[in-house]
Amino acid sequence: GGDLHSGRWWWCSDRQAATPLASGVHALSNAALNEPWPKVRRLSAALEEALRGDAAALAERLFTLLGERDVAADADLPATGVGIERERLLSPIFITTPDGRYGTRCSTLVLGERDGQSWRLQVIERTHDRRGDSSAERRVTFDRWPQPGHRPAVN
């Protein structure tokens, strides 16, 4: 969770109480935040690079990143207990399986841009079919969010 006004953000999960996040880039896969899996390291580094580029092309750069299907080298794979073949299958940022029963089903971006005292937030989601092809895109924009004068309760 977080607070756009103060810039404070927290991470929590079913295994960890809310913990304040340091400023910077954080990445998440199916484990703890910033778990040093190859795809998490790749996402973190590429996101930092993407944020330094042209803002107008940011969403497309990020969707390209989320669509990467490179398999990590065996020596870099985590040992999560599913066996080496499954680790290989799960190692790309974008996962597809031969039978199409498991894999990436959507890629979602939440982009924020400060607009005076408020923010313009854009949520863009691409849905993928069983083969991994994009089948739909949805966009929702929140202009001037939160509304000027609104301050969340602070404990």
Model-derived regions, located:
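N-terminal nucleophile
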Residues: 1-155
